[in-house]
Amino acid sequence: MVLLHVKRGDESQFLLQAPGSTELEELTVQVARVYNGRLKVQRLCSEMEELAEHGIFLPPNMQGLTDDQIEELKLKDEWGEKCVPSGGAVFKKDDIGRRNGQAPNEKMKQVLKKTIEEAKAIISKKQVEAGVCVTMEMVKDALDQLRGAVMIVYPMGLPPYDPIRMEFENKEDLSGTQAGLNVIKEAEAQLWWAAKELRRTKKLSDYVGKNEKTKIIAKIQQRGQGAPAREPIISSEEQKQLMLYYHRRQEELKRLEENDDDAYLNSPWADNTALKRHFHGVKDIKWRPR
């Protein structure tokens, strides 16, 4: 199995294994799905952290309004009355004005937070350092865990306009957002390795050979964005260590230049006649009377 270290730009994303005989059409779609799936889990975790703190989303026509404005316009949050967290709600106002402030109690909040941490760990970039490959099954498992936690805390479900429910139903609208720019459509995804595009019409082995123990750094890119930057010769960590070494060396040389003390000339090892006296047997002669 060829090991692919998938990156976006210079940032590590995940590890993935594939046989050398894999069609690049299939592999590119697979990489794009895992990449986008990880982004989906990250978006859900971010929104669920807000859900744990401030409750469900307000209706779009009530978001950003003050209590006085809501009362003046006679607006009512009907879904807020239906979607009550299990065990009762604790009021915690959302300063941004996106959520209704009816947060879950401490026990239910911990259910959400613990599940969020577990889901983050599954798709974490630290999996690269640990040598763990991320598969679509793992991404789906993380999504299922998040869905289950929401169902436990909100047995009556979430409003249809809540971004968490929309994510679970694949109805999310990311147009005009930074999150939307990060997503790469499967049909427009490209894989690059060694400054070459891995064309979908070929097999992986056409580029990396038939050695199944090969490890490559593959960069995922949106079509039309051009070739990604080449990998640096040394990593950022190695560069830091190199700079630190030269800085220490420079400081050491600087101290030696400043130290013009010649007291070392009185040391035995600095005496150029010591060897001669040693062979003549006059090494430890003292001229003073005892």
UniProtKB/Swiss-Prot annotation:
Keyword tRNA processing among UniProt keywords: no
Main location: cytoplasm
GO cellular component, one term: centrosome
Record: disease: Ciliary dyskinesia, primary, 26: A disorder characterized by abnormalities of motile cilia. Respiratory infections leading to chronic inflammation and bronchiectasis are recurrent, due to defects in the respiratory cilia. Patients may exhibit randomization of left-right body asymmetry and situs inversus, due to dysfunction of monocilia at the embryonic node. Primary ciliary dyskinesia associated with situs inversus is referred to as Kartagener syndrome.
GO biological-process terms attached to the record: cilium assembly; regulation of cilium movement
Pfam families membership: CFAP298
Modified residues (Phosphotyrosine): Y264
UniProt keyword list: Cell projection, Ciliopathy, Cilium, Cytoplasm, Cytoskeleton, Kartagener syndrome, Phosphoprotein, Primary ciliary dyskinesia
Assembly and oligomerization: Interacts with ZMYND10.
Organism encoding this protein: Homo sapiens
Family to which the UniProt record says this protein belongs: Belongs to the CFAP298 family.
Protein name: Cilia- and flagella-associated protein 298
Compartment annotation: Cytoplasm; Cytoplasm, Cytoskeleton, Cilium basal body
Lineage of origin: Eukaryota, Metazoa, Chordata, Craniata, Vertebrata
Task of the protein: Plays a role in motile cilium function, possibly by acting on outer dynein arm assembly. Seems to be important for initiation rather than maintenance of cilium motility. Required for correct positioning of the cilium at the apical cell surface, suggesting an additional role in the planar cell polarity (PCP) pathway. May suppress canonical Wnt signaling activity.
